[in-house]
Amino acid sequence: MSSYFVNSFCGRYPNGPDYQLHNYGDHSSVSEQYRDSATMHSSRYGYGYNGMDLSISRPASNHFNASERSRSYSAAAATTAAAAGPEAGADTRYNQPATSSPSPDPLPCSAVVSPSAGDNHHGIKNSIASPTTSSNSSSSSSHISRDGVGTSPGTEDDTPASSDPPSSQNGQSTAQQQPQIYPWMRKLHISHDSMGGPEGKRARTAYTRYQTLELEKEFHFNRYLTRRRRIEIAHALCLTERQIKIWFQNRRMKWKKDNKLKSMSMAAAGGGYRP
């Protein structure tokens, strides 16, 4: 609530401590920090700077639903005023009989949200307690929290908190079922899985044109590779040492076969030729 709206009521209503406190004796016995109307926290206790109750003018979207409870409070106050008379009707808002509702909080600036209901969830931090107020507050069913806001064990606000653990467990189970795939876990070569034959047989590796060209160039200069050279080629072509070794073995076998056929053809051609 803005200070502009609160200050507009300063000249119309008397000071807050001038009203008589019910069941708590004279207001002079209360601490000075609660008698001073300028130091009261309007947003927490529902009062303005002059001690006036502004809970009726609050919007319906606040945390305590003051608009609905204020209407029921006004109806109860009108009934009490009609029964007590015109003289007592002026102060019925601030002087309620003890039988209509449980005793309010021991602060003069605390707002009575719903006197007809027994579950008054309005907590106050560092409240001043007296022997009389302690006996009255023990019989009431109000729950006071340390943070300054009353909480109920069975409200709708507890359902999101109770539903958080299952959602977090579902997220963890989903993360466990779907492990993250890193780039080095993927296959770097194209393999014909359908042409692999039996399941126990290793799939045949299909080399790219660039890889085949580089391997052919290396085989042209040297048909046998050292361990260091094999590692260099494997890193350069993104292959493994085993693939390089097998490719060179197959290439040598092919080279020997070609040379053997070539020599045999040359021998046959030379034997049949008679100068």
Swiss-Prot record:
One of its GO terms (cellular component) is nucleus. One of its GO terms (biological process) is anterior/posterior pattern specification. GO terms for molecular function: DNA-binding transcription factor activity, RNA polymerase II-specific; RNA polymerase II cis-regulatory region sequence-specific DNA binding. Residues 84-177 are annotated as: Disordered. Residues 200-259 bind DNA. The keyword Acetylation does not apply. Its main location: nucleus. SUPFAM superfamilies: Homeodomain-like (SSF46689). It is found in: Nucleus. Coiled coil: none annotated. It holds the Pfam family Homeodomain. Residues 93-102 have a biased composition (Polar residues). InterPro entries: Antp_homeobox, HD, HD_metazoa, Homeobox_antennapedia, Homeobox_Antennapedia_CS, Homeobox_CS, Homeodomain-like_sf. Keywords: Developmental protein, DNA-binding, Homeobox, Nucleus, Transcription, Transcription regulation. Residues 126-143 have a biased composition (Low complexity). It comes from the Eukaryota. Belongs to the Antp homeobox family. Sequence-specific transcription factor which is part of a developmental regulatory system that provides cells with specific positional identities on the anterior-posterior axis. This is Homeobox protein Hox-A5.
